[in-house]
């Protein structure tokens, strides 16, 4: 009986240590989430501005049809998917839901298996695809908790350049969209060719206030790739925010589970201890009766 008490006590101590670790990790994820949400809000100011400027400059082109390759749909021979996952686990179902959505998309739209490629951001996704011999054009691992544009610029600009060079004909980003600390939504969004600019949102009055040099066309030649890059970067920031929220929720759940286990083990410990005391009393009484 004493051995059982010792074993239960060890399990309680071990679970308490685990609970302290998961509680600390939850607090870390919570702090990261706050920073990431603020970064996302700050980026939206830039994203809204570049979207408005791009739409205004394209005002006439959107209505009559632009010849810029960033806007023109061409026959689809190959599709690229930027898949954003985490580098580590302990984020609940964050990675599995994204990867399931990607695999479902591949199954539905690419039965031949040779008309798509993956651009992977995050080690979990890279390892998943390579283990299944799914083509990965290139990857990025070790992303910071709040990535700067400089950190991801190479993979973003490379993706846009590959599209311009017709190495693939459309580009999607697969990621988890952050809604709040408890909710996220997997999205598979088309980024190229650019199709989210609405001519009705354009204002010729805004363009009239611009001094365009050397020309509108020359500016758009530089601006459209930057706009596409901003869309991808925005998705990365959004995904990181969702990742931190998932990590915080997972660690809170783990802490709650640890508390429940400790509670159950403590009750078990008390029952076993009470049984041991009762057994000892019974033996003492029996011994005393034997002496009488």
UniProtKB/Swiss-Prot annotation:
One of its GO terms (cellular component) is plasma membrane. PROSITE patterns: ATPASE_GAMMA (PS00153). It is found in: Cell membrane. CDD domains: F1-ATPase_gamma (cd12151). GO terms for molecular function: ATP binding; proton-transporting ATP synthase activity, rotational mechanism. Produces ATP from ADP in the presence of a proton gradient across the membrane. The gamma chain is believed to be important in regulating ATPase activity and the flow of protons through the CF(0) complex. Belongs to the ATPase gamma chain family. This is ATP synthase gamma chain. It comes from Streptococcus mutans serotype c (strain ATCC 700610 / UA159). The gene is atpG.
């Amino acid at each position: 009986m004493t051995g059982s008490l010792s074993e239960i006590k060890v399990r309680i101590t071990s679970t308490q240590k685990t609970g302290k670790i998961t509680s600390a990790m939850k607090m870390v994820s919570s702090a990261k989430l706050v920073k990431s949400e603020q970064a996302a809000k700050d980026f939206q100011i830039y994203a809204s501005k570049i979207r408005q400027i791009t739409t205004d400059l394209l005002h006439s082109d959107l209505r009559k049809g632009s010849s810029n390759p960033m806007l023109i749909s061409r026959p689809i021979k190959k599709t690229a998917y930027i898949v954003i996952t985490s580098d580590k686990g302990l984020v609940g179902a964050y990675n599995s839901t994204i990867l399931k959505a990607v695999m479902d998309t591949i199954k539905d739209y690419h039965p031949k298996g040779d008309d798509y490629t993956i651009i992977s951001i995050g080690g979990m996704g890279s390892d998943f695809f390579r283990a299944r011999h799914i083509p990965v054009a290139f990857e990025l691992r070790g992303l910071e908790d709040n990535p700067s544009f400089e950190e991801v610029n190479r993979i973003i600009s490379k993706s846009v350049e590959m599209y311009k060079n017709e190495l693939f004909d459309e580009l999607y980003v697969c990621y988890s969209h952050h809604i709040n600390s408890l909710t996220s939504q997997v999205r598979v969004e088309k980024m190229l060719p650019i199709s989210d600019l609405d001519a009705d949102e354009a204002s010729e009055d805004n363009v009239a206030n611009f001094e365009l040099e050397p020309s509108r066309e020359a500016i758009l030649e530089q601006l459209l790739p930057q706009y596409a890059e901003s869309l991808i970067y925005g998705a990365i920031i959004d995904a990181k925010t969702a990742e931190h929220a998932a990590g915080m929720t997972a660690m809170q759940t783990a802490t709650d589970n640890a508390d429940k286990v400790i509670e159950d083990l403590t009750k078990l410990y008390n029952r076993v201890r009470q049984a041991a005391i009762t057994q000892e009393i019974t033996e003492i009484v029996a011994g005393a009766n034997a002496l009488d």
